[in-house]
Amino acid sequence: MSTNLTTLDSLTKNVYLPGLPNWVNLRRPLYGRLEKVTKKQRFRGRKFIFAAQDGLPQGGGGIAESETLPTAGHTSVVNMELAMKYHYYVARLSAQVMDAASSDVGAFADAVKTELNGIRNQLEEDLAVNGLFGDGSGAIAEVASYSSATLTLKTQPVVGQNGSRNLRKNMYVQSWAGKSGGTVQADHRLISAIPSTSTATVPTSAGFVANDYVFRSVGAGVDPRNKVVMGLRGIVDDGGVVDSFQNLSRTTNPSLKCNVLGNSGTLRAWTPDLMDEAAMESALNGGGKSPSAIYSPIEIQRRAAAYLRTDRTYDMSIKTLDGGYKGVTWTTPDKQIPWFWDRYCIPNRVDFVCEEDLFLAIQQDVGFADNDGRMWRYTDRKDEVEAWLRTWRNLGARACNNHTSLRDISHTL
């Protein structure tokens, strides 16, 4: 028998390429813009309270000569409250792995840097998902069906559904029948793979039920609902999703309703006429301000570009916008409005947002918990250490009626 690789298996070495490539899509341009252009309010305290004028003093009118003057009116002012949301992300390493994976000799990458960068990226991604897609409840998907180890999520062409886009490998999730109240259906289940844009692999007998809402889980038996930052689904809303907004009812405070141009839940094709109507809706029926930006999923912007390539009366050329972002603009009688896309934007919607009315209340910016001067801390009487990355914040709005939501737009031509 000749000498070959089988007989010399114990003698030959494996050769490893250096470095650790990242296969995770970390692109989240729109939330980065939202953080830059939104007014930031830094404060100390339990919650953020602010006032808004929702009515003028209506003490006036025409009178005849020598008649009694009109009865004086008064300005109407309401107080709104924005509670803080506390986001935490934990990295935990044993002393042995920190030592073994501290150089190129022992590992592909430094374990400490890999884990700390990982939780920072995950925090930023969760803020983007909840800020752009969410409504403050923390729901990131809806269950279509569940069989064996396959969890199927609602996706296009179901209105407003993103499939498995907001889920991640190694994420723990829970499912609930509602966004508040009720009991948990599937508690703290691990996602081991994302095989497609509409499915996730979970344990068998996990307990998911059709039409459940899916939430990121922070631990078994811990209710994760309504503990994350508010998102555009809750702000650019007329009360259909979030009825009580910033501690006020949208029913009795219509100024907290955005303008909605929908089609009763039936998908329709994107057209320039719909865009023009939405661009002017705030001036006609809202608070009078013009939207400063347009947010939509990339699929709708692609449909618009395909539609307009044959119509030279519209300009869909790429422009450099504020902050160095590349994008297109939509021309209205008032001004040109930059149009941005993001994979986390709400499906089937084109939102015309008055960014001036948004604000970001921050009690603790993104950083590691080191109040006692230490970033790493020992836990559980083990030779293991943890680092806690955190931010205490929430996204709010001083008004909502300057936003317009163009809804029920198909992702296909």
Segments (PLM) and residue ranges:
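Core alpha/beta structural scaffold of self-assembling particle/tube/pore-forming proteins
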Residues: 1-57, 61, 73-413
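Short, charged, low-hydrophobicity "junction" segments
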Residues: 63-65
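Helix-start/capping segments and mature chain N-termini
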Residues: 67-72
